[in-house]
């Protein structure tokens, strides 16, 4: 078999691999991963149509029923991925809204099945472009908003935030642009060129693999977020900012509650005897930061004291030990926050302190 054949079935193999990987654990999956399972099921059908187009039909034209199926899948994958983002960010989507999101692809596919024409194919391409733009813009907005909610709820967000998924949206956009350009060039131009087949299908295979890998590895469930942040009833008479601030400072600074691992806004609210909304509002408006930054800034300041203390006593500064002492659960979180608040790594910061102390 030629190299073209392997290039043409690579996206299909990747789609089937991830569909099986998710489907065999379907009952144990959370709502987001169940949507991702459906996504890879649709991708498998879509890439099967591609494989048949490139390798089975000599004139490289799909029969109208298969072409209609290809239309439906092409115009469904991006909306389904957007539904996955909605599930991932604790945004419930009603059945009616889901139907509206998926309707364009189904209607255009039915229209092509009944009245196959180049005009409908052009409509399909235009709708596809609009879908990609909406998924990238609206999806990125939802992911950023959820990251902010995470930073307002947890001290450490490394294993929870949406940066990998946000970065994937850029990949999706670039590959979608690639697909649109190839659509404009036409199937015949792509199919008759080995390099264009490689350019068309290999990036799609890489994208599908990354989508599956990041989705599969994600362990933080939105159900956990909802459990950690239950709906609360606001008291009729909110505490004065001065009084609330004093309670927060007593807990976090005097009692050094920030040294506890895995603390959440709910933990602080319970200790202070107030509600999360008021505490979050106080930290945002009066202290000018998120809950995560508030806690981790104190942790890094404490870590700096420990590093200098170890250095003055001629002891080796074991950053992994210090990270745990000041409340971080792992070195990765410690290093990221240290760089965030100081602009440098712990080693570079220590060398700078030694140099300044030597000069003084």
Task: State where each predicted segment sits.
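N-terminal low-complexity or simple alpha-helical regulatory segments
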Residues: 1-115, 120-126
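Hydrophobic faces of stable alpha-helices that mediate helix-helix packing
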Residues: 10-14, 45, 79, 140, ...
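Hydrophobic cores of alpha-helical transmembrane segments in multi-pass inner/ER membrane proteins
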Residues: 11-17, 74-83, 130-141, 204-213
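Juxtamembrane transmembrane-helix termini
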Residues: 21-31, 53-60, 84-93, 138-151, ...
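Alpha-helical transmembrane segments of multi-pass integral membrane proteins
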Residues: 26-48, 70-74, 124-186, 191-207, 323
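Juxtamembrane/interfacial segments around transmembrane helices
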Residues: 59-68, 89-93, 120-131, 151-163, ...
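Membrane-proximal linker segments that couple transmembrane helices to downstream signaling/catalytic modules
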Residues: 213-332, 337-340, 347-360
């Amino acid at each position: 078999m030629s190299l073209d054949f392997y290039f043409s079935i690579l996206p299909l193999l990747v789609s089937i691999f991830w569909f099986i990987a998710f489907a065999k654990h379907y009952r144990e999956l959370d709502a987001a991963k169940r949507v991702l399972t459906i996504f890879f099921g649709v991708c498998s059908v879509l890439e099967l149509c591609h494989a048949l187009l490139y390798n089975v039909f000599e004139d490289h034209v799909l029969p109208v029923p298969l072409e209609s199926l290809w239309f439906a899948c092409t115009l469904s994958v991006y909306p389904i991925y957007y539904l996955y983002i909605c599930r991932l960010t604790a945004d419930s989507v009603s059945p009616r809204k889901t139907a509206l999101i998926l309707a364009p692809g189904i209607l255009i596919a039915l229209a092509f099945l009944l009245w196959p024409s180049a005009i409908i194919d052009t409509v399909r391409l235009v709708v596809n472009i609009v879908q990609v733009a909406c998924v990238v813009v609206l999806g990125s907005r939802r992911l950023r908003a959820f990251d902010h909610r995470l930073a307002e709820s947890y001290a450490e967000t490394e294993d929870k935030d949406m940066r990998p998924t946000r970065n994937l949206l850029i990949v999706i956009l670039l590959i979608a642009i690639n697909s649109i350009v190839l659509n404009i060039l036409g199937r015949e131009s792509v199919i008759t060129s080995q390099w264009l087949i490689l350019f068309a299908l290999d990036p799609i295979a890489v994208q599908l693999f990354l989508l599956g890998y990041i989705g599969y590895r994600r362990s933080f469930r939105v159900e956990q977020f909802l459990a950690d942040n239950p709906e609360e009833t606001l008291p009729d008479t909110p505490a004065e900012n001065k009084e609330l601030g004093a309670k927060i400072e007593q807990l976090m600074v005097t009692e050094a509650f920030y040294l506890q691992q895995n603390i959440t806004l709910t933990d602080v609210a319970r200790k202070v005897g107030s509600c999360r909304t008021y505490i979050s509002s106080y930290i945002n408006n009066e202290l000018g930061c998120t809950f995560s930054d508030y806690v981790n800034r104190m942790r890094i300041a404490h870590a700096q004291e420990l590093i200098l203390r170890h250095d003055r006593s001629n002891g080796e500064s074991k950053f992994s030990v210090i990270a745990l002492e000041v409340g971080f659960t792992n070195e990765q979180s410690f290093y990221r926050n240290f760089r965030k608040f100081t602009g440098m790594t712990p080693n570079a910061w220590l060398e700078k302190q030694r140099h300044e102390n030597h000069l003084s």
